[in-house]
């Protein structure tokens, strides 16, 4: 039976989570799915566990690869996409899992029903605290990572509405392989690799369908690479912002992205200010100002160069993001004051 979708699983120090992931995977109908694991080489037992899983389930279409050196999640995603031979692919991270046994079945049925560029699913988000996982939001009722899904007709998604109301995560999306490859987009970055890809990909899509199933259980961990507060984290973010605007410009989507009537750019940046200046992040910059000064300067250079500061942060109405935008302005004032002295 021909495989219709590849389940792409980028791995990095994933051994502690693989049992949960394997259990959710084995409940799926995998007759028309291929599973591809790619381990970003590091000194742990992840690759051996993956090889053992493949051997124990040789009735399934499982492929396991390991990089020669550690290159980061972006490079691994690029390599996974290059390995795809099916019409569609779907990213899921090994520290997450499938929500229920019907996820792949619903994906395959949607693929059989019609051709599409992107298929979006619902998610369940968990906050990992101590030894317990608390459900903090059922999506897409109201958005943390996935917001409202507005349908135009039948199962077709209103593209601009979806772009405006959803955050930039590449997991839990069924992606047409030919469509994606024609975009010539690459992930590359070690962190926040989704940001430069997500917007150009969605703006370029002609048909987005809604697959009415909860696809991924997403677990927010305070010790993950993307949540750890550090200088490399913020430098990576700035690099991703730079690449995002380049990608949008190259594929002709920049005008739509910055159009004030769409309010897409404004929402993106206000939510990014939460990433930069909420709670412990704000304290990090205050306590380590001498070390983080260059990072903040680089951020402001980018915002000014691309007109973001004037378009987004000079307007009066910042909504629920007011406090974080004020913190951005606070650091701008501090930097300008020090440069005058």
Curated annotation (Swiss-Prot):
Activated by the negatively charged lipid dioleoylphosphatidylglycerol (DOPG) and inhibited by N-(n-nonyl)deoxygalactonojirimycin (C9J). Its EC number is 2.4.1.-. Its cofactor is Mg(2+). It is found in: Cell membrane. InterPro entries: Glyco_trans_2-like, Nucleotide-diphossugar_trans. Keywords: Carbohydrate metabolism, Cell membrane, Glycerol metabolism, Glycosyltransferase, Lipid biosynthesis, Lipid metabolism, Magnesium, Membrane, Transferase. It is an enzyme of class 2 (transferase). Pathway: Glycolipid metabolism; diglucosyl-diacylglycerol biosynthesis. The keyword Magnesium applies. It catalyses: a 1,2-diacyl-sn-glycerol + UDP-alpha-D-glucose = a 1,2-diacyl-3-O-(beta-D-glucopyranosyl)-sn-glycerol + UDP + H(+); a 1,2-diacyl-sn-glycerol + UDP-alpha-D-galactose = a 1,2-diacyl-3-O-(beta-D-galactosyl)-sn-glycerol + UDP + H(+); a 1,2-diacyl-3-O-(beta-D-glucopyranosyl)-sn-glycerol + UDP-alpha-D-glucose = a 1,2-diacyl-3-O-(beta-D-Glc-(1->6)-beta-D-Glc)-sn-glycerol + UDP + H(+); a 1,2-diacyl-3-O-(beta-D-galactosyl)-sn-glycerol + UDP-alpha-D-galactose = a 1,2-diacyl-3-O-[beta-D-galactosyl-(1->6)-beta-D-galactosyl]-sn-glycerol + UDP + H(+). GO terms for molecular function: 1,2-diacylglycerol 3-beta-galactosyltransferase activity; hexosyltransferase activity. One of its GO terms (cellular component) is plasma membrane. The keyword Iron does not apply. Belongs to the glycosyltransferase 2 family. The local lipid environment around the enzyme affects both the extent of head group elongation and total amounts of glycolipids produced. Processive glycosyltransferase involved in the biosynthesis of both the non-bilayer-prone beta-monoglycosyldiacylglycerol and the bilayer-forming membrane lipid beta-diglycosyldiacylglycerol. These components contribute to regulate the properties and stability of the membrane. This is Processive diacylglycerol beta-glycosyltransferase. It comes from Mycoplasma genitalium (strain ATCC 33530 / DSM 19775 / NCTC 10195 / G37).
């Amino acid at each position: 039976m021909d495989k219709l979708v590849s389940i792409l699983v980028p791995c990095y120090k994933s051994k502690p989570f693989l049992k949960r992931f394997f259990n959710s995977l084995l409940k799926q109908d995998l007759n028309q799915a291929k599973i591809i694991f790619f381990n970003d080489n590091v000194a742990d037992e992840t690759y051996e566990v993956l090889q053992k899983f493949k051997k124990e389930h040789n009735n399934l279409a499982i492929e396991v690869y390991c990089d020669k050196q550690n290159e980061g999640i972006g490079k691994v995603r690029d390599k996974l996409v290059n390995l795809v031979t099916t019409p569609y692919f779907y990213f899921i991270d090994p520290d997450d899992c499938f929500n229920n046994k019907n996820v792949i079945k619903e994906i395959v049925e949607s693929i059989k029903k019609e051709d599409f560029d992107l298929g979006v699913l619902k998610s369940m988000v968990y906050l990992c605290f101590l030894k317990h996982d608390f459900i903090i939001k059922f999506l897409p009722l109201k958005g943390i990572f996935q917001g409202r899904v507005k349908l135009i007709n039948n199962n077709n998604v209103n593209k601009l509405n979806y772009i405006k109301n959803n955050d930039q995560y590449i997991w839990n999306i069924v992606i047409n392989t030919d469509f994606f490859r024609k975009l010539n987009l690459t992930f590359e970055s070690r962190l926040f690799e989704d940001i430069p890809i997500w917007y150009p990909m969605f703006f370029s899509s002609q048909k987005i369908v809604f697959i009415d199933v909860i696809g991924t259980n997403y677990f927010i961990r305070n010790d993950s690479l993307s949540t750890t507060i550090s200088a490399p984290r913020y430098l990576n973010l700035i690099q991703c912002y730079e690449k995002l605007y380049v990608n949008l410009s190259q594929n002709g989507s920049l005008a739509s992205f910055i159009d004030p009537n769409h309010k897409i750019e404004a929402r993106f940046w206000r939510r990014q200010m939460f990433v930069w200046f909420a709670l412990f992040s704000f304290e990090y910059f205050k306590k380590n100002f001498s070390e983080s000064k260059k990072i903040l300067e680089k951020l402001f250079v980018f915002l000014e160069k691309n007109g973001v500061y004037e378009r987004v942060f000079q307007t009066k109405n910042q909504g629920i993001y007011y406090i974080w935008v004020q913190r951005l302005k606070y650091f701008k004032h501090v930097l300008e004051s020090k440069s005058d002295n």
